UniProtKB/Swiss-Prot annotation:
Phylogenetic classification of the source organism: Eukaryota, Fungi, Dikarya, Ascomycota, Pezizomycotina
Segments of skewed composition (Low complexity): 303-319
EC number: 3.7.1.3
Reactions that this protein is recorded to catalyse: L-kynurenine + H2O = anthranilate + L-alanine + H(+); 3-hydroxy-L-kynurenine + H2O = 3-hydroxyanthranilate + L-alanine + H(+)
Compartment(s): Cytoplasm
Native source species: Phaeosphaeria nodorum (strain SN15 / ATCC MYA-4574 / FGSC 10173)
Protein name: Kynureninase 1
Main localization of the protein described in the UniProt heading: cytoplasm
Length: 506
C-alpha cells in the first residue's frame, strides 16, 4: 500500500468548517447523485413506533421531516430504491407463473431462478477483482467460511495450525476453533496475532508477517479480515497473501468490511479463497445471502489433478477422483453439480468448474433479487471512483474531528491515519464514561452510528449515499454531544425513548 495523506489537512479552519465548503464538495462531485438511488430515513422515521415511513406534514414536528445522518453502512447498508421494485417483480413472477419461474425468461422480469446465481457473477467479479467463474453468491458469511475451510484447511502431521487476528470478529474465532476441533486437534493449534503492545491500536505489516513467519513451518492456514471490524484497519491483502504463499501457507480472507468498501484484486493477488456478506456496504438487506471467492487454480475440474506439493500444502491437497474427474475436495451439494447433469439424479457429482462448484442448495431467489438490486446500483459507477470519493469523504470527517473547538478533543481516532490503510470507517474512542451520554444526544438529533462497548463509536460515511454536508452536520451535533457529556455525563438516559439501541451487529 502506498503512503497517502489527508488532502484536507492544509485547509484553514474558517474554510474547512463552513457549511458552504461542504456543499461545494458535494456540488462538484458527480457521484453525489447516487444518493437519490437510496431511501434515506427521516428523523421522524427513526423515532416512529410504527413500522414503515412516518407521514410528513403538519402532524410531524419540523425537524422530524429532515433526513437523518446515517453513518452505519458498516453495519447495515441503506435500502436502494430499486430493491422494492425488483422484489415485487420476483413476487409477481412467483404468483403468476409458479414453478415456471425457475426456467422461463419472461419479458420485463428477472432472470429465471435456475440461472439467477449466474446473473450476478459479472458485477460481483468487478467489485472483488476476480474472474466471473471465481465468484459465487451463496449461503452466509460464517457458513461460507466453514465450507471453504472444509476444503482448504487440510491439516497434516507437519502443518496443522490456523493463524487468525487476535481481535477477529467472534464468529471467525468460533469457526476457526471449531474447524480445529472437527479434526480432533488441540485448541492450541489456533494462533492469534496480538498487538505488540496495549497502546498499539492496530497491527503493522511487519508484525503480521513476523508472526506468520514464526509459525510458518507448522501452519496450514492463515485467515484474516480484509478490514478489521473494530479499528477499521485495511490490511495489505496483496503483501500478506504473497508472504503466505511464499511460505507454502494457504490464505483466506474475511471480506465482510471490505467488499463494496475498497477496491479488491483477489485474482491478481493470488488469494486462495475469500468470503463476505452483502448487507453492509453492499446494501443487499439484513442477513441477506453472502458471497465467496475461489481462485481459478483451485476450481479446476478435469482429468489432470492440480499441481501439488508432496504433503498437499499450499492449498493443493490430493484431489478427489471420480471416474476420471479430478477436483478439489469439498462438502458437496446438488446445486454445485454441473447444470447439464444436475437433474439426472444419477448420484455422480460433477462439480461446476470454479466457485459455483462449492454451492450446496439452490439459493433463495428472494435474496438473490435483493442482491441484484444492489449490484445494479454499483454498476452505475466503479469501485475505483467510489474509493476516490470515499477517501475524500472520510478524510474530511477525520479533518473535522481533529478540529475540536476549545482545545484537546475528548476522544481519539484509533483507525490508521494513512488513508491507504483504512476504508470508509473511522473508529473514535471516547473518554471513559462518555459513551451513553453521547449516544443519547446523537440519537435525539437523528444521527445513526455504531457503538462498541465500552467507549468506541464506529463512524462510516458510505460514498454511495452519504455527503459532505452529512459530515458537516454530524460534526456540529457530535461536538455538542461531547460538550454535554463532559459537563453532565451522568444525567443523560442510557438510550432515548423510541429509538433502538445503537446497532450492535457488524
Amino acid at each position: 500500500m502506498s503512503q497517502t495523506t489527508n488532502s484536507y489537512d492544509s485547509f484553514q479552519d474558517a474554510d474547512l468548517c463552513s457549511a458552504a465548503f461542504a456543499e461545494k464538495q458535494d456540488e462538484k462531485d458527480k457521484l453525489t447523485k447516487l444518493r437519490e438511488d437510496f431511501y434515506i430515513p427521516t428523523k421522524g422515521d427513526l423515532i416512529n413506533k410504527k413500522y414503515g415511513f412516518q407521514k410528513s406534514g403538519n402532524n410531524a414536528k419540523g425537524h422530524e421531516n429532515g433526513k437523518c445522518i446515517y453513518f452505519c453502512g458498516n453495519s447495515l447498508g441503506l435500502q436502494p430504491t430499486r430493491t422494492k421494485e425488483y422484489i415485487n417483480r420476483y413476487l409477481d413472477t412467483w404468483a403468476s407463473k409458479g414453478v415456471f419461474g425457475h426456467f422461463t425468461d419472461y419479458e420485463g422480469g428477472l432472470p429465471p431462478w435456475l440461472h439467477i446465481d449466474d446473473a450476478v457473477k459479472e458485477q460481483t467479479s468487478k467489485i472483488v477483482g476476480a474472474l466471473p467463474s471465481e465468484v459465487v453468491i451463496m449461503e452466509t458469511l460464517t457458513a461460507n467460511l466453514h465450507l471453504l475451510m472444509s476444503s482448504f484447511y487440510r491439516p497434516t502431521k507437519d502443518r496443522w495450525k490456523i493463524i487468525i487476528e487476535g481481535k477477529a470478529f467472534p464468529s471467525d474465532h468460533y469457526a476457526a476453533l471449531s474447524q480445529i476441533a472437527h479434526h480432533d486437534l488441540d485448541p492450541s493449534a489456533l494462533i492469534t496475532i496480538e498487538p505488540p503492545s496495549s497502546s498499539a491500536p492496530y497491527l503493522s505489516n511487519e508484525h503480521i508477517l513476523s508472526v506468520i513467519s514464526k509459525h510458518a513451518a507448522t501452519t496450514a492456514l492463515v485467515l484474516l479480515p480484509g478490514i478489521q471490524f473494530y479499528s477499521g484497519q485495511f490490511f495489505d491483502i496483496e503483501l500478506i497473501t504473497r508472504h503466505c504463499r511464499a511460505l507454502g501457507i494457504t490464505v483466506g480472507w474475511d471480506l465482510a468490511h471490505a467488499v463494496g468498501n475498497v477496491p479488491l484484486k483477489l485474482h491478481d493477488w493470488n488469494v486462495d479463497f475469500a468470503a463476505w456478506c452483502n448487507y453492509k456496504y453492499m446494501s443487499g438487506g439484513p442477513g441477506v445471502i453472502g458471497g465467496a471467492f475461489v481462485h481459478e487454480r483451485h476450481g479446476t475440474v478435469g482429468e489432470t489433478a492440480p499441481t501439488t506439493t508432496p504433503d498437499g500444502t499450499n492449498g493443493n491437497p490430493k484431489t478427489i477422483s471420480d471416474e476420471s474427474l479430478t477436483y478439489r475436495p469439498r462438502l458437496s451439494g446438488w446445486w454445485g453439480n454441473d447444470k447439464s447433469s444436475r437433474f439426472t439424479m444419477d448420484n455422480k457429482f460433477v462439480p461446476i468448474p470454479g466457485a459455483s462448484g462449492y454451492q450446496l442448495s439452490n439459493p433463495s431467489a428472494l435474496d438473490m433479487t435483493s442482491v441484484m438490486a444492489s449490484l445494479d446500483v454499483f454498476a452505475l459507477t466503479t469501485m475505483d471512483a467510489l474509493r476516490e470519493r470515499s477517501i475524500r469523504l472520510t478524510g474530511y470527517l477525520e479533518a473535522r474531528l481533529l478540529r475540536y473547538p476549545g482545545g484537546e478533543p475528548p476522544y481519539t481516532i484509533i483507525t490508521p491515519t494513512n488513508p491507504a490503510e483504512r476504508g470508509a470507517q473511522l473508529s473514535v474512542m471516547l473518554r471513559p464514561g462518555m459513551l451513553d451520554s453521547v449516544l443519547h444526544h446523537l440519537e435525539k438529533e437523528g444521527v445513526v452510528v455504531d457503538e462498541r462497548k465500552p467507549d468506541v463509536l464506529r463512524i462510516a460515511p458510505a460514498p454511495l449515499y452519504n455527503t459532505f454536508r452529512d459530515v458537516h452536520d454530524f460534526i456540529g451535533i457530535f461536538h455538542e454531544a461531547c460538550r454535554k457529556a463532559l459537563v453532565k455525563p451522568a444525567e443523560a438516559p442510557k438510550h432515548s425513548e423510541g429509538v433502538p439501541k445503537a446497532i450492535q451487529t457488524t
